[in-house]
Amino acid sequence: MTEQAAVLLIFLFVGHFLGDFTPLATARMLEAKLTGSPIGPIALHALVHAVLVGLAVAAIARPVPMLILAAVSVEFWTHLGLDWVKGKMSVRRPGLGDPGQSIFWTALGIDQFAHALVLVGIAFLALM
């Protein structure tokens, strides 16, 4: 792995942390993610992540507009889809929304792993 790839991955993962685990994820966004609706706050949450990805790619990879747009689009749509599906699944299986249940932690791990795979893919494509 090149130094550039390592730095880009670090920026992408720090951005993911900031988007999910700081005040950038508002109470309204978090509430909507619990049930998968309304979609607006989930889309806004995905947009926050997409902007952070765009900034990382522009800063570390290449400031090529089409590359940045592609990275932002991939992040927005995959983040929106993953969070929406997880919310809808939580309605059908209430344990997914309860930190006291082991299934909650399994689902959180799968969710975060899926988001990480998307970020690795974005880094790969950005540095091709």
What are these model-derived regions, one by one?
Residues M1-M128:
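Hydrophobic alpha-helical transmembrane segments
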